[in-house]
Amino acid sequence: MLRPATPLAVLLFAAFGLLTLATISTPIIKQIPLSSFEIKDVGDLSFGVFGYCTSSGCSPIEIGYDTSAFSDKINSDFDIPRATRSTLSSILIVHPVAALITLINFVLAIVAHFHSPSHSARYLLILFIVSFVDFIVCLLCFLVDVLLFIPHLSWGSYIVVAATILVAFCGLVTCAMRRTLVNRKANRKRIAENAEMSGENYYNRQAQTAPVTQVTGPQPTVPMISGANGGGDKLPEFTTFEKKDDRSEERIPLTSVSPIERSPATLVNDSTPPNFMDGAPSRSPSTTPVGRDQYGNPLPPQDGYAMRVGPQNERLNSRGRGGMPPGGYRGRGGFPGPGRGGGPPQNGRGGYGPPGRGRGGYGPPPRGYGGPGPRGGRGPPPQGYQGGPDRRPSPGAPYGPGPGVGTYGPSQPSPYANRQQSPGPQFAAPGYGNPEQPGPQYSAYNPRRVSLPRAESPPPLPGIDDGMPGPAVELDASPANRGVGQYGIRDSDSDVAGMLAMQQARVPDPDRGNDANGHSQEGPNDVYVPPRQAWNQGFVGSTPGLAPPTARGPTRPISEAVTATVASDYYEDVDPRFAEPSAAADKRPPPISMQSPPASNSYDDIPNRARSPAESENSNFTSISQRGINPRWNSANAPMPPPVAGVYAGGGGGGNVVPRRPVNRPGAGPADGSDLFLNSNPDFQLPGRGGNMPRAAGPR
């Protein structure tokens, strides 16, 4: 293995070999003379370190020569006198000494190949000193040879010169090795003393910026196992690692919306109207997702029909004279509110029971100058439905549960006893009243608040509810679902108007309280009569009692009638602010002999499931979009068509005309044949009764 001391060893080995040859010269090896010359009469003469040789023989091996034995001729050939040459001949002994020192130096060079001596400046210093001494001895040998044998030097003396030169080079190599080591150590020392060069400052800065490692508590030590191979090691028993936690403590979803960011319209659409009133199941065919606040709690429920609470836009004549007190939507069993012209309190509908509960009888006559309210329909009326046409669009919220829905027959404690009632006309069928619609008021139509598309129920035609009512008709009692018709839908305008939502595969509310046979669970005494049969029977009994057209006069002042019929034909196609009053049309009473044919459809015991208008027996249309558009809805002052033969004032008819319930509008005159625009679909027939108030023609 090559080391820095390898060249030194090679040089020393060569020098040692040369010195060895010079030492074993003549007389040991006669062929290696240090000096030789030829003398006449004597022959060849050669000299070595330990003697000389002549042609006749060699001297014994000894240190120094006896020059007196030579003739004067031999001594005269040398430059130094004979006595001096005899003294110098004894100094030839330095040749073996030089060879020995060279050998020692060679051994030291071999040792310098090891790591420890080679990295020791002191050892290299010793090697250098030995090399220097060796050089001096070799040089002395050469000088002795020159002084003693000049001018007859032989090649033996020259190899001593070569050995001296090699030893000199070995001294230089040793010096270089030591100098290199010393410089290396000096550099390390300087680097160690300089903090910037050694990186101490860098590591100090790193230590200052390094994160503090988490120090764990004292850990229990593991007992050392003693035995043949037992013994404690110096390695750490526990190692602590720090793991970065990437998980966030934030648990609030990024998509959550706090209640502060909700607008009033958003609150209305996101909140679910109460599906239950006093434990009553919901009758709404569709549901709205429940809104939640930023903590995941459900928002408080809104009013019964998902109408926003706040300042409302009251329509004209909402509480004035001639108007009707505010009531609910067109629902069943309505009663008037606290306006002028109210009725008995709200308590659902029943048979002919007391006015406090059930749908029987009329309330006390209106107080003050209030006009007739709308007929008690199938749902809560818009706010401000007070004897005159409501000039606001229909609410955009889905058809909610109709308050005040009870059963026909004797008055029973109903689970809907505390539900709000919808307003009814002044002269309505038994059980229809004019309740007040307390609580939140309905505001103007806002397209952004519409949650579900639905078909609009046309408002009642004017001049139908003004007539005197006929005698009360006892309704037939037949067991059926409590006010639920075909496919789990009530026979009301609000439920039929929601057919578009049913076409979108919306199923009925599963919370309806029906048993396995489809019958109501309200009580054993609850009976049900299909609404349309009740209307037909009511009209049969009440129509003959109507006064002749000539004997019927206006029951209210002309100005009041005009006020009630200014926008009576408004079908939410024009904003109420831009509706123009229409001229009074021909105020003709309906024929006396008109009677309603019996109902041809029965909706009893139909399984509750999603229904489609294509399953209607009398409808030729499968979608609301297939119905034609009334070509005269934009005509402002077009007269109404004459009455159709065989059609009674409520919109029913004989012959090929499909019967339907009359469209009722408070404060309007008797109906004519122009209200047959919905005869093509019996599901959109609206309730109505004859009145004594003339109607005015207007746009539809």
Curated annotation (Swiss-Prot):
It comes from Neurospora crassa (strain ATCC 24698 / 74-OR23-1A / CBS 708.71 / DSM 1257 / FGSC 987). Required for the proteolytic cleavage of the transcription factor pacc-1 in response to alkaline ambient pH. Residues 226-491, 507-560, 573-700 are annotated as: Disordered. The keyword ATP-binding does not apply. This is pH-response regulator protein palI/prr-5. It is found in: Cell membrane. Belongs to the palI/RIM9 family. Keywords: Cell membrane, Membrane, Transmembrane, Transmembrane helix. Residues 30-90, 145-152 are extracellular. It holds the Pfam family SUR7. Residues 657-671 have a biased composition (Low complexity). Residues 414-424, 593-603, 615-637 have a biased composition (Polar residues). Residues 1-8, 112-123, 174-700 are cytoplasmic. Residues 234-252 have a biased composition (Basic and acidic residues). InterPro entries: pH-response_reg_palI/RIM9 (IPR051380), SUR7/Rim9-like_fungi (IPR009571). Residues 320-378 have a biased composition (Gly residues). The chain crosses the membrane at residues 9-29, 91-111, 124-144, 153-173. It is a multi-pass membrane protein. Its main location: membrane. One of its GO terms (cellular component) is plasma membrane.
